[in-house]
Design a protein with these regions (language model features):
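Residue-level signature of transmembrane alpha-helical entry/exit and packing/kink sites
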Residues: 19, 23-27, 73-74, 103, ...
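Structural signal for the C-terminal ends of transmembrane alpha-helices
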Residues: 35-37, 56-69, 113-126, 193-202
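Alpha-helical membrane segments and adjacent membrane-interface helices in multi-pass membrane proteins
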Residues: 44-112
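Hydrophobic transmembrane alpha-helices
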Residues: 2-75
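Short, charged juxtamembrane terminal tails flanking transmembrane helices
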Residues: 2-10, 203-212
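Membrane-embedded alpha-helical hairpins and interfacial helices in multi-pass inner-membrane proteins
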Residues: 120, 124-204, 211
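Aromatic-anchored segments of alpha-helical transmembrane domains
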Residues: 27-39, 78-92, 140-152
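Short helix-perturbing small/polar motifs within transmembrane alpha-helices
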Residues: 80, 90-147
Length: 212
């Protein structure tokens, strides 16, 4: 049985909590720092939500992680994202209310796709797959599907467009696709660089210990 599916029911609660927090806390901080400003500005970073859920899927599957810890990670980030949105709505009013429309629940499958994209990448890496190529493929597929889900739901269900039709939707689809996929990719590149840096440092420490 692979490490991704081994039972961990006997694992001490303190270990489960530590396993959860070491993964959840950095991602939650990134979500808190960027989600309130969905498009970014000169003073605010662009929204990192898509990258956060992709990275969460990766890190909550990377290594031996209990299934309960994974579920808590996903639903904890969903709850945090919803809380940020509703607080933003309360503080800023009408503009944010456009996002809290009948299309809003479709963010759940959109983020779920990103989560499973990251989880697939973790499995590929642990199976010895080529990291860079697998990462690009995972993000390209998961990011595109997530965009289609969230964009289509917002266009057809939000009520923002009085007379929606296919031609206009396709035009808007292509207009925002590049930004949707590339902006989170910048966060993913930064995360990959940090991951490789810490992995290299850890290997160096282990080599020093084994040499002593």
């Amino acid at each position: 049985m692979s490490t991704l599916s081994q039972p961990h029911s006997a694992e001490p609660r303190s270990n489960l909590l530590a396993s959860f927090l070491v993964r959840f806390a950095p991602l939650a901080l990134l979500l808190l720092a960027t989600r309130a400003e969905h498009f970014g500005s000169a003073l605010n970073l662009p929204d990192a939500s898509k990258a956060v859920f992709f990275l969460a899927g990766f890190y909550f599957a990377f290594g031996a992680v209990a299934n309960g810890v994974r579920r808590a990670g996903f639903w904890g980030l969903i709850a945090l994202a919803v809380a940020i949105d509703f607080i933003s709505f309360w503080l800023s009013g009408r503009e944010t209310a456009l996002c809290l429309s009948p299309s809003y629940p479709f963010l759940l499958p959109a983020y779920g796709v990103l989560w499973f994209g990251g989880r697939w990448l973790a499995g590929r890496l642990q199976a010895g797959g080529q990291f860079a190529l697998s990462a690009v493929a995972a993000w390209a597929v998961a990011g595109s599907i997530s965009y289609l889900l969230s964009n289509a739901a917002f266009y057809w269900l939000s009520g923002r467009y009085a007379e929606p039709h296919v031609a206009e939707y396709l035009a808007r689809l292509s207009q925002y696709f590049v930004g949707f996929v590339t902006t989170p990719a910048l966060y993913l590149v930064a995360a990959a660089a940090l991951h490789l840096m810490f992995a290299r440092a850890l290997r160096g420490q282990r080599a020093e210990v084994s040499a002593q």
